[in-house]
Amino acid sequence: MYPRHPFLFGGNFPNVKARYTQMRRQARLHETGIMGVLMRTKPTLAIVIPCFNEEETLPLMLPRFLAKLDRLMHENRVAEDSFLMLVDDGSEDSTWDIISALARHNSRVRGIRQSRNRGHQNAVLAGLMEVRDRCDASISIDCDGQDDIDAMDEMISRYQEGFDVVYGVRSSRKADTWLKRTTAQAFYRLLGWLGAEVVYNHADYRLLSAPVMK
């Protein structure tokens, strides 16, 4: 039996905690680990980053994302063909110029551009659809640096244990406006009233295995 509900896992994360759910194990488990426990090998990881008018943020954050990816490779946590997928959501500034220039000079950076601004969730979805056949797992994360990128280590550990969905969950909404907090609470109440299983305060910061994306 696999857990039906999400569970909280620990970690010293200042801005994000994480929850994970385990689906039916449709994904291939590549190796048998210690004492017969099935473990996945290191995945080809795609880090999907939606961007909209981020010409000031990208020069600051891209080196951090690349350094994180390099460290994960160096520590043998992810495969050498792992990469960043940057999604330009119809930016009106030089965001796409920055992405395309970096992609030309760094094989670990790839990018796609939406014809117009379609919204954050559509940008994330476009990135996931682009990478789903090119990776074993993806992690989607915002470009603004508010999420703790070191939480990726724990997400990858859970993936290697066989979990297909790992949620980032906000430990606090204090940075949100009163209106955003109020509408979020109303949204979660509505979902609960409709009988949906709700992961409260979950963020777009999450890991998905390739079978889930497909």
Predicted features along the sequence, with ranges:
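Aromatic (phenylalanine/tyrosine) cluster motif
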Residues: 2, 7-9, 13, 20
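N-proximal low-complexity "stem/linker" segments adjacent to membrane-targeting elements
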Residues: 33-67, 71, 76-78
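Residue-level recognition of the N-termini of beta-strands and the immediately preceding loop/turn
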Residues: 43-45, 79-84, 109-110, 136-137, ...
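Donor nucleotide-sugar binding loop of glycosyltransferases
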Residues: 54-57, 91, 148
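Alpha-helix termini
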Residues: 68-79, 106, 131-136
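Short beta-strand/loop segment that forms part of the nucleotide-sugar
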Residues: 73-90, 113
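A conserved acidic beta->alpha catalytic loop
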Residues: 85-96, 145-146
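Acceptor/aglycone-binding surface of glycosyltransferases and processive sugar-polymer synthases
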Residues: 112-116, 120-130, 137-140, 146-214
